[in-house]
């Protein structure tokens, strides 16, 4: 039986972590790609040399030519510039848009049947541009955002309540930025909604709002601490969960930046919503009822993403 092929486009901190995790999970053969010749080859060799110790069999190679990704089943895109302290995700737009154009052309030529997961920031605008540049079906191109944001929310809640992270589910909608919308009403501890836990006295509404704000600032908090880079362990783990659901047809319900075509009243944009990921890619977008305050917050987030997409069109009119 032919093994799956996973192409990791970008061999920085997230790319290297992705390669290691994909190897440990034996998801298939792995290609680390980067235009900086030597880095993907070196990281690929280093990770491959860990396989006898870790006990996984995976052909792991590094490459600096797009032809190496030919026939990939999954492409995970991390190429681009990472945030530095004081930068917003949006500050990266002009630089990383040019990168997405090159990546899109490479995927279009060599891996047109792949399921593509974009991690590059500003996420919602970059995945939108990548889909346009690559010409791949919208259900096969998705952004990694909600899995990470929800994971951060879950961790902070688990620490607050002193319970296992496994018993906390969390729901984050909207753009992957300061306007993201963590939904307390749809987030639970052992099935009990957070709003009920406030009523039960487990925490105050004010404390819950502090946790929600920390979730919004989750990436910036790490950037501020690292000073020379941004998060990579949790983003990589989040993308691997998405890739695994696709490769194994698990049909997991995962919040992702997905292409909306009328859902939630949004047209031709990528925004974070709950999805079902299976062998068909994004097989379903789940529309939930939002109350007035939630809808206003979601619409504000959508407007922020729309502004980024307009900025992309100004730089690259072909995206229109």
Swiss-Prot record:
Substrate binds at residues 83, 89, 121, 152. Coiled coil: none annotated. It catalyses: (S)-malate + NAD(+) = oxaloacetate + NADH + H(+). The keyword Oxidoreductase applies. One of its GO terms (biological process) is lactate metabolic process. NAD(+) binds at residues 10-15, 34, 96, 119-121. The active site is at residue 176. One of its GO terms (molecular function) is L-lactate dehydrogenase activity. InterPro entries: L-lactate/malate_DH, Lactate/malate_DH_C, Lactate/malate_DH_N, Lactate_DH/Glyco_Ohase_4_C, Malate_DH_type3, NAD(P)-bd_dom_sf. It is an enzyme of class 1 (oxidoreductase). It comes from the Bacteria. NCBIfam families: MalateDH_bact, PRK06223.1. Belongs to the LDH/MDH superfamily. MDH type 3 family. This is Malate dehydrogenase. It comes from Rhizobium rhizogenes (strain K84 / ATCC BAA-868) (Agrobacterium radiobacter).
């Amino acid at each position: 039986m032919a093994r799956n092929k996973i192409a990791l486009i970008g061999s920085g901190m997230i790319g290297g972590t992705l390669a290691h995790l994909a190897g440990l999970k034996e998801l298939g053969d792995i290609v680390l790609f980067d235009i900086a010749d030597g880095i993907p080859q070196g990281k690929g060799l280093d990770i491959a040399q860990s396989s006898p110790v870790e006990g996984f069999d995976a052909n792991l190679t590094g490459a600096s030519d797009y032809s190496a990704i030919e026939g990939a089943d999954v492409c995970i895109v991390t190429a681009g510039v990472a945030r530095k302290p004081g930068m917003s995700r949006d500050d990266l737009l002009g630089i990383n848009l040019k990168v997405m154009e090159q990546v899109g052309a490479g995927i279009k030529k060599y891996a047109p049947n792949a399921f593509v997961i974009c991690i590059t920031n500003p996420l919602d605008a970059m995945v939108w541009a990548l889909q346009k540049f690559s010409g791949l079906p919208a259900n096969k191109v998705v952004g990694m955002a909600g899995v990470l944001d929800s994971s951060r929310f879950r961790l902070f809640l688990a620490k607050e309540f002193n319970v296992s992270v496994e018993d906390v589910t969390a729901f984050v909608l909207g753009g992957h930025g300061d306007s993201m919308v963590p939904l307390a009403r749809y987030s639970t501890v052992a099935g009990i909604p957070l709003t009920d836990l406030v009523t039960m006295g487990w925490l105050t509404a004010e404390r819950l709002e502090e946790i929600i704000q920390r979730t919004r600032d989750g990436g910036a908090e790490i950037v501020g601490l690292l000073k020379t880079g941004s998060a990579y362990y949790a983003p990589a783990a989040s993308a691997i969960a998405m890739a695994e659901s696709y490769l194994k047809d698990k049909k997991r319900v995962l919040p992702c930046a997905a292409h909306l075509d009328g859902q939630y009243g949004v047209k031709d944009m990528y925004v974070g919503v709950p999805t079902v990921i299976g062998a068909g890619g994004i097989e379903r977008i789940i529309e939930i009822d939002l109350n007035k305050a939630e809808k206003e917050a979601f619409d504000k987030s959508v407007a922020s993403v729309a502004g980024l997409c307009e900025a992309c069109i100004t730089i690259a009119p072909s995206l229109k």
